[in-house]
Amino acid sequence: MKILVVNCGSSSLKYQLIDMTSEEALAKGLVERIGIEGSILTQKVNGEKYIIEEPMKDHKKAIELVLKALVDKEHGVISDMSEIAAVGHRVVHGGEKYASSVLIDDEVMKALEDCVKLAPLHNPPNIIGINACRELMPKTPMVAVFDTAFHQTLPDYAYMYPLPYELYEQNGIRKYGFHGTSHRYVSSVASEMMGKDLKDLKVITCHLGNGASLCAVKEGKSVETSMGFTPLAGLAMGTRCGDIDPAILLFMERELKMSPDEVDTVINKKSGVLGISGVSSDFRDIEGAAEEGNKRAKLALDVYHYTVRQTIGAYTAVLNGVDAIVFTAGLGENSAASREEILNGLEYLGIKIDAEKNKQRGKQIEISTEDSKVKVFVIPTDEELMIARDTKEITAK
């Protein structure tokens, strides 16, 4: 059984064709600059690159070229489109309606449209991608896998904001959380590595990329997470501010005469470690600058590590203890220095790190010592595989 996994952005599209017998990706690809001059599709099969450069006016044209690349006689991996048993779509926001992945039909599409107001940047391209696939592959079942779904198990006191209750009732203003597919995947792998049932464990998962969030997992369920109504909340990130005093936004508008759009640009695109360092949103650049004596770069890293450490401490309280901490995503998987700094100060939990093991980059590994009371893992995330597994399970029913 082969499943196509699609992740549509506003001008890009990532895809993988996964053989579910071996759970291996037969092909991985990226389409860039959709609707912009210089559109390009890059597909990788067994390390070999295949590139298509031609105009792609919309996502439908992009998906046409994806299917063309997959069945290409020389560079493709399937002989016919009928080999694609189902398509799994990453959808950022499922609102309160969806606590798990779902088979797509017209009713689901309407619900996704209703969620656009909650994710105006992300849901529209997700919907466009689904519509294009449904048009080009009308007989192939489609499944929506939501970033928010895993966090629908948060208790009401964890997701409710202390605002007038009517704002929740009438406008859906509450904590939703994101990166759910990643948190779900790495927590399940951690339990496998420990040889225990996830339902018997308390796990804190740290998805640390340009966007970053933490999740507290208890009895296999998300009970707390750092992102909120939007992916702006929580930790300091690459370009996002994370949690700040909300009155700062009013100050920016009233005193600095900034428009709501200007404020939005500042808190979403000009803040985080980029804003503090003035160097970059790329942690490799900031680490390099800090090593060369750039004080603002060092401060940016200190603030970032502090917000992660602070949140791990809070989630240990939420869980009433912790059995395992997992690092994943770009920074979590690849920066030994950041992992060390984040855990520095959590010795009271009985965490002991093996310095040699911690030097490993991008590999699935336990980095805690044998006598560490809390297991610490680095687990490369695989959201595409999780989407494919959900798609297989739902279409098999």
From Swiss-Prot:
Name the gene that codes for it. Answer: ackA
Name the Pfam families for this protein.
Answer: Acetate_kinase
Provide the GO MF annotations for this entry.
acetate kinase activity; ATP binding; magnesium ion binding
Record NCBIfam families? ackA (TIGR00016)
Protein source organism: Clostridium botulinum (strain Kyoto / Type A2)
Q: What is this protein called?
A: Acetate kinase
Annotated Gene Ontology cellular components are: cytoplasm
The upper taxonomy is: Bacteria, Bacillati, Bacillota, Clostridia, Eubacteriales
Q: What does this protein do?
A: Catalyzes the formation of acetyl phosphate from acetate and ATP. Can also catalyze the reverse reaction.
Q: Subunit structure, per the record?
A: Homodimer.
